[in-house]
């Protein structure tokens, strides 16, 4: 990648972060750009994403994932004040693929310990490699089916992974007693919400605006109902 394209990507990342109200350190900006470079470098080998263009990767993957960081930070801060989530909170990102949004969460929320699980070994290996390359001691790649993980995790997240009913059913045993699910979706999934079992509740829906992306995005927060 040329110096010009590097500069262009950095400018777009900084503008996008500002538009999202994200206060990122210089180290975090560098880590995000280095992660983007890793995605580009290993994509052909690991088949991490169908997106090949660096600018499109930035918009559709990096900024799309960054849009979920402010809601996650607010949740961690709120629960931390209540004593349920604290420094070292654990997050499980399900079906993480190339590490989206899990790696982005690990970079932007260093107080959160992030585990990215995927059934494809080479994708989990890529995340583990990214953790080492980026110096992220709070990031772990796990090759497993989510149903086999015991947790407990304070937050279980996914992005374009599965229907809500499947996502919550498969990952429920990994959720801590006070834990919540964070599901990143496109359009508001009315049908998926209607199909949820009675013991799963959607307690908050947030509409997201992704800089440079003309598409609907939202986050759903869910929790088990006793």
Curated annotation (Swiss-Prot):
It is an enzyme of class 2 (transferase). GO terms for cellular component: cytosol. Pfam families: GidB. It is found in: Cytoplasm. Its EC number is 2.1.1.170. Keywords: Cytoplasm, Methyltransferase, rRNA processing, S-adenosyl-L-methionine, Transferase. Its main location: cytoplasm. Specifically methylates the N7 position of guanine in position 527 of 16S rRNA. PANTHER family: S-ADENOSYL-L-METHIONINE-DEPENDENT METHYLTRANSFERASES SUPERFAMILY PROTEIN (PTHR31760:SF0). This is Ribosomal RNA small subunit methyltransferase G. It comes from Acidovorax ebreus (strain TPSY) (Diaphorobacter sp. (strain TPSY)). The lineage of its organism: Bacteria, Pseudomonadati, Pseudomonadota, Betaproteobacteria, Burkholderiales. The gene is rsmG.
């Amino acid at each position: 990648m040329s110096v010009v394209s590097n500069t262009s990507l950095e400018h777009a990342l900084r503008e996008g972060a500002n538009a999202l109200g994200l206060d990122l350190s210089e180290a975090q900006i560098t880590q995000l750009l280095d992660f983007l470079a890793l995605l580009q470098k290993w994509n052909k080998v690991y088949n991490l994403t169908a997106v090949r263009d660096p600018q499109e990767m930035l918009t559709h993957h990096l900024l799309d994932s960054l849009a979920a960081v402010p809601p996650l930070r607010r949740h961690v801060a709120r629960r931390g004040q209540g004593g349920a989530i604290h420094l070292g909170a654990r997050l499980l990102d399900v079906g993480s693929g190339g590490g989206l949004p899990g790696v982005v969460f690990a970079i932007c929320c260093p107080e959160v310990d992030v585990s990215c699980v995927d059934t494809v070994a080479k994708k989990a290996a890529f995340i583990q490699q990214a953790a080492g390359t980026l110096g992220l001691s709070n990031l772990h790649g796990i090759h497993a089916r989510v149903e086999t993980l015991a947790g407990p995790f304070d937050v279980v997240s996914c992005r374009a992974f599965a229907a809500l009913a499947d996502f919550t059913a498969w990952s429920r045993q990994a959720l801590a007693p006070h834990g919540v699910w964070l599901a990143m979706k496109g359009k508001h999934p009315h049908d998926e919400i209607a199909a949820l079992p009675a013991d799963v509740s959607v307690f908050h829906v947030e509409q997201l605006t992704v800089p440079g992306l003309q598409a609907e995005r939202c986050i759903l927060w869910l929790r088990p109902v006793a």
